[in-house]
């Protein structure tokens, strides 16, 4: 499959697309923000970067198990992060955090709808020009390639349709709206192309693999490149390639300690799940778990093809490859059937594997990292001055290169704005308005007042999670993950009140942070007095719109 010509205004292969005839002095001036650690000395090629992003792939429940080739080709050849988190356990806010390097309260994407700023005109106007790919393209001279799922509302007619190509992308091969495997439409540099249900030409994961390999043949050899490949797997509808549809027949969702138990002393939304689950519900989630793994086998093939092609072209040793997911997932934990959105480790913790120049093989890092760090890291690799950005994240490059005596964060923020229906669900008349994502047995995965903010703390002394809900209770959940890794026991009422106050203080500071102030929660003020009702401005409004004032 051949790529269509570049999007309007992009130059073709065969000459550098940035200042093809400028003097060396002028080139240094234009790329001055990207000199960094690599420089632009004669004969020096700045590294290439590939970012592989899956959809809903967990880390806690064994989501990396099917990807044997990926673990061998990326993880074993580089570094695996064992404590990688997302700032929101939902596709669009998390992907926006990757692109901008910002927490949701700073990029203002709060859910998967246009009203929640997902690929809205406001997002396009305010955030897209400042994403790290836009900086790579405009300031660092990288050719940039995107293939796959962008944001859940991308292609919506009210936000420019498929003709809209975000700033910063030289090659654009994006899926309309949410993940599918067949019968979808792609925007190819702003032109729509429909795909059907013929496996050999339409299976999306394979299409992304083919067009990515094509880019490596088609690209300019005068510029470094950045590739972002965002697969549909393992997102529903969990359609595996034909050759993998019988794989993992003896695999079941993990029966860990928090599987199919009541969410005692948790937020009401978790407590409402019916325990024990019915046999039919367990069969359904076991089947979903199995199919998710099946879809990932095609991702494993994609990774292998990509690495082999980079090796064949002689570019592998000068290329950083990142592999991660936009959020985790659950299958029966606390009797919640299947979804993400919740504050627990299974939903907010993701795989993160990196290989590249200067990274020793078979490394594991326990440092607390988040997907807001990906943009700063990639810009740092390109040599861009991070002080010129307003990103909340930190560059992982010192960790990747084995820096010693490194000063690093101890806290990351997780925040989520719940969604609910305005009317009673006709299939569940016993439920009041305000819930959503409900299953036939009326177990719901979300609600308006499932709005929460958490601080996840990892240090030499603590391995804690502290969360507050924006509801009438101002409900608090606290977990000691050293003693209770499955987060079964909420210790909010038994923990030392002084420590509780410190965690609340850190959370308040992170929720009001921006840029550099997000990288540390600051020094605890001994005069601070704990009052959880200060966390949210509307003090328990059930149908909260805490972020809406920022949408322009």
From Swiss-Prot:
Keywords: Calcium, Disease variant, Glycoprotein, Hydrolase, Lysosome, Metal-binding, Mucopolysaccharidosis, Phosphoprotein, Signal. Its EC number is 3.1.6.14. It is found in: Lysosome. Its main location: other. Binds 1 Ca(2+) ion per subunit. One of its GO terms (molecular function) is N-acetylglucosamine-6-sulfatase activity. One of its GO terms (cellular component) is extracellular exosome. GO terms for biological process: glycosaminoglycan catabolic process; heparan sulfate proteoglycan catabolic process; keratan sulfate proteoglycan catabolic process. The form A (78 kDa) is processed by internal peptidase cleavage to a 32 kDa N-terminal species (form B) and a 48 kDa C-terminal species. The conversion to 3-oxoalanine (also known as C-formylglycine, FGly), of a serine or cysteine residue in prokaryotes and of a cysteine residue in eukaryotes, is critical for catalytic activity. Its cofactor is Ca(2+). The modification 3-oxoalanine (Cys) is found at residue 91. It catalyses: Hydrolysis of the 6-sulfate groups of the N-acetyl-D-glucosamine 6-sulfate units of heparan sulfate and keratan sulfate. CDD domains: G6S (cd16147). The keyword Calcium applies. Ca(2+) binds at residues 55-56, 91, 326-327. PROSITE patterns: SULFATASE_1 (PS00523), SULFATASE_2 (PS00149). The active site is at residue 91. Hydrolyzes 6-sulfate groups in N-acetyl-d-glucosaminide units of heparin sulfate and keratan sulfate. Belongs to the sulfatase family. This is N-acetylglucosamine-6-sulfatase. It comes from Homo sapiens (Human).
């Amino acid at each position: 499959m051949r790529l269509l010509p570049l999007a309007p205004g992009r130059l073709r292969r065969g000459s550098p697309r940035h200042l093809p005839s400028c003097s060396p002095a002028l080139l240094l001036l234009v790329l001055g923000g990207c000199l960094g650690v690599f420089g632009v000395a004669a004969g020096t090629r700045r590294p290439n970067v590939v970012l592989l992003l899956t959809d809903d792939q967990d880390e806690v429940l064994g989501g990396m198990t099917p990807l044997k080739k990926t673990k061998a080709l990326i993880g074993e050849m580089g570094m695996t992060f064992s404590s990688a988190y997302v700032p929101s356990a939902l596709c669009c806010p998390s992907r926006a955090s990757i692109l901008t390097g910002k927490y949701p309260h700073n990029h203002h994407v709060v859910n998967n709808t246009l009203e929640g700023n997902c690929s809205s005109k406001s997002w396009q106007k305010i955030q897209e020009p400042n994403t790290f790919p836009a900086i790579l393209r405009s300031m660092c001279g990288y050719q940039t390639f995107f293939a796959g799922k962008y944001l859940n509302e991308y292609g919506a007619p009210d936000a420019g349709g498929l003709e809209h190509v975000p700033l910063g992308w030289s090659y654009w091969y994006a899926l309309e709206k949410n993940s599918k495997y067949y019968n979808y439409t792609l925007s190819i540099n702003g032109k729509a192309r429909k795909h059907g249900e013929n496996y050999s030409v339409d299976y999306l994961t394979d299409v992304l693999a083919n067009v990515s390999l094509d880019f490596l043949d088609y690209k300019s050899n005068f510029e470094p490149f950045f590739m972002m490949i965002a697969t549909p797997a393992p997102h529903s509808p969990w359609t595996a390639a034909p050759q993998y549809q019988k794989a993992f027949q003896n695999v079941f969702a993990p029966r860990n300690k928090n599987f199919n138990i009541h969410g005692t002393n948790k937020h009401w939304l978790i407590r409402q799940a019916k325990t024990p689950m019915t046999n039919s519900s367990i069969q359904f989630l076991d089947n979903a778990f199995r199919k998710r793994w099946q879809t990932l086998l095609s991702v494993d093939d994609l990774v292998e093809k990509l690495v082999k092609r980079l090796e064949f072209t002689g570019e592998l040793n000068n290329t950083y490859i990142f592999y991660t997911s936009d959020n985790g997932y659950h299958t029966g934990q606390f009797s919640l059937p299947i979804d993400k959105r919740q504050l627990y480790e299974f939903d907010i913790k993701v795989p993160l594997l990196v290989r590249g120049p200067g990274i020793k093989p078979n490394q594991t890092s326990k440092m607390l990292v988040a997907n807001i760090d990906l943009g700063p890291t990639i810009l740092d690799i390109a040599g861009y001055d991070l002080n010129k950005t307003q990103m909340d994240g930190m560059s992982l490059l010192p960790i990747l290169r084995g820096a010693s005596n490194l000063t690093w964060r101890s806290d990351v923020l997780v925040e989520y704005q719940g969604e609910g229906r305005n009317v009673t669900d006709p299939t569940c008349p016993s439920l009041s308005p305000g819930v959503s994502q409900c299953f036939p047995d009326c177990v719901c995965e979300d609600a308006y007042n499932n709005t929460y903010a958490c601080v996840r703390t990892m240090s030499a002394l603590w391995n804690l999670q502290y969360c507050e809900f924006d509801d009438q209770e101002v409900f608090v959940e606290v977990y000691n993950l050293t003693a209770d890794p499955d987060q079964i026991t909420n210790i909010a009422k038994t923990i030392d009140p002084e420590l509780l106050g410190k965690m609340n203080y850190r959370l308040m500071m992170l929720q009001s942070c921006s840029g550099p102030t997000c990288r540390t929660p600051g020094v605890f003020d001994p005069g601070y007095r704990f009052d959880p009702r200060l966390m949210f401005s509307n003090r328990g409004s059930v149908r909260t719109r805490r972020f809406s004032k920022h949408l322009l």
